[in-house]
Amino acid sequence: LAADLRKPSAILVISAHWEEAIPTITSGTTPSLIYDYYGFPSEAYKIEYPCPGEPVLAQQVAQALDQAGIQARLDDQRGLDHGAFVPLKLMYPDATIPCIQLSLVNTLDASTHLAIGRALQALDYDHLLVLGSGFSFHNMRAFFAAQTPEIQARNLAFEDWLEQTCSDSSLSEPERAKRLADWEQAPHARFCHPREEHLLPLHVCYGLANKASDRHIAATILGKQSGMFYWG
């Protein structure tokens, strides 16, 4: 995907792995890495990604949220979790592009995250890449269970709904936003997302884009269908 994109001047990541009471933005100049995973080989805890932070962008994000009536705060001590540094290491391995991270809100309310995305429309920052890092299927028990026709059917039904919701140009934006706000009504939604933190980065990205996605990329991971969406 990075090869198809103009190289950004900075990156804003919304990761499924960070929740706070209010939206919180990393604002340090040299973010550390948070190895927030367990049971992996020792090499997984030696990964390095020494990208710079971008305090000016962090302040702009906080101001955009404040102007939309959304209280936010800066955190100059927190580093980047693996929802940020893993995709960034694959996309931009030289680690020269400044990066900041924006938390989810721990209520996990879909409409709140759509509103956060809409607030980010006020950002005035040239060539900013906004990366929603999550998973369109995140039932860990099902990932490691034997694949069955029933599990596959549930997975595919939700993926089809999500692709249509994000990509169907015949939907109006109010219709698209309502479907995402009411995502629990989708086929097998709670089977695919027993907890919704891995879905909500998508809501922030759609709230910012406010249009049908330009591209859908399907992938199979541990036998389960998953989808990624690109807005240009």
Q: Locations of the language-model features?
A:
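Short, basic/glycine-rich phosphate-binding loops at helix/coil junctions
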Residues: 36-41, 92-100, 181
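A short aromatic-anchored loop/beta-hairpin motif
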Residues: 1-68, 72
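Short acidic (Asp/Glu) patches
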Residues: 43-47, 79-86, 113-116
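Conserved ATP-utilizing enzyme core subdomain
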Residues: 70-96
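Short beta-strand segments
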Residues: 12-17, 103-105, 131-133
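Gly/Ser/Thr-rich loops at beta-strand to alpha-helix junctions
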Residues: 17-20, 135-139
